[in-house]
Amino acid sequence: IYGDVEHSGNFEYLTGFMTRFEEGLLVLQADGAAALIVGNENMKLVKSSRVPAKAIHCPFFSLPNQPMEGERPLEELLREAGVQPGRKTGLVGWKLFTSKDGRNSHRFDVPSFITEAVQQAAGADHVENATALLIGPHGARRTNNANEIAHYEYGSALASDGVIRAMEALQPGMTELELGGMLNAHGQRCSVTTICAAGPRYVKGNLYPTDR
């Protein structure tokens, strides 16, 4: 199960944390055993994972120019995590492919260097896209318990409160930066993408609030 700062939903759902600017892999076995393959900065977070997991260090999952001591081939790390040749192996990214051409099980949205390593470790013919297990029509994340619903409602409320706060403060002469600063709250990541623009949007390709 793959995760990075922009594609952390499935990874974070099971581990409780996102790997920020590093890549990360959660390897789950049928018997419940788990391993987390992570970079330098996330080794300390493995002990806090919701799913108890063995920590396996992969230095090149780290940011560029960080220490690379102890690096080993990724396929070797995957085998240590439990990926075995000839065993059916599911690779979970973040996107559910819904094409009608019958090839979705062999489309992968995970970085190619990781996909290729998984295929080398398990055998290319034994690797399939398994994202549907989490976000498919009958996926685990499609059913929410009361606690999850409360968290999603909290995120939704923060987002809508931010919009109301900005709308009520709107007055002539305010800049996009001033209004944009009202869209987030409580130091939380917003559950939607915040956009604050006035007048012609995307001037010179800029997508972010300015001081105009």
Each model region followed by its residue ranges:
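Acidic, glycine-rich loop-and-beta core segments that form the ion-binding/anion-interacting portion
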Residues: 180-212
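Charged, often glycine-rich, active-site loop that binds/positions anionic groups
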Residues: 11-16, 141-148, 209
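Flexible, acidic/His-enriched mid-domain "rim/lid" segments that flank
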Residues: 65-191
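Acidic/histidine-enriched ion/cofactor-binding microenvironments in catalytic or ligand-binding pockets
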Residues: 18-22, 27-31, 83-88, 111-121, ...
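Residues in well-ordered beta-strands of folded domains
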Residues: 37, 56, 90, 195-197
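N-terminal accessory/capping or targeting/presequence segment of soluble
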Residues: 1-72, 76
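Generic beta-strand/beta-sheet core signal
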Residues: 2, 92, 197-199
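Flexible loop/turn segments at secondary-structure boundaries
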Residues: 6-10, 44, 97-99, 202-205
